[in-house]
């Protein structure tokens, strides 16, 4: 699964306008609604924010992966929000989250997001990529970083 197949420019909010965790989740859901992927956001927003109370999506190191299933989703869908200031997502390391990757899966494949998040996490572990994502000023820069990383990964796989 390629990240660039899901994270196109219209799926990247940079900068995210939200100042709170709840606002960030709503802003990301609204973007999916704007793209005609979702017809409504209020129930999903309530479900995700309720889930966050018991199972925070913050993974530490400045990133959060909120996720939920929806009957409106046929396949994995996602949107990435980037906050220069960072948002409090109750991260285990206490750091604010600068990258919020919201994923939605179909109810038939509720765990379909795991491969995608794992791939994103591997990419984010690369210090150059992480720095580039955090310093980017336009969604196009983000998609270029993702494409370059995936191209490099493909070359590495060919050499192995």
Listing of model-derived features with the role each one plays in the protein:
Residues 1-160:
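Cytosolic covalent-transfer regions centered on His/Cys nucleophiles
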């Amino acid at each position: 699964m390629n990240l660039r197949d899901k994270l196109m420019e219209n799926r990247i909010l940079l900068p995210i306008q939200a100042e709170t965790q709840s606002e960030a989740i709503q802003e990301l859901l609204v973007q999916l609604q704007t793209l005609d992927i979702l017809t409504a956001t209020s129930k999903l927003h309530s479900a995700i924010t309720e889930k966050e109370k018991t199972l925070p999506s913050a993974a530490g190191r400045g990133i959060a992966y909120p996720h939920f299933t929806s009957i409106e989703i046929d396949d994995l869908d996602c949107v990435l929000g980037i906050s220069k200031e960072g948002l409090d997502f109750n991260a285990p390391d206490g750091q604010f989250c600068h990258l919020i990757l919201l994923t939605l899966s179909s109810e038939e494949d509720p765990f379909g997001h795991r491969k995608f998040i794992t791939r994103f996490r591997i990419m984010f572990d690369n210090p150059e990529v992480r720095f580039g994502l955090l310093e980017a000023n336009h969604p196009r820069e983000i998609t270029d970083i993702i494409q370059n990383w995936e191209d490099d990964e493909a070359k590495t796989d060919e050499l192995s």
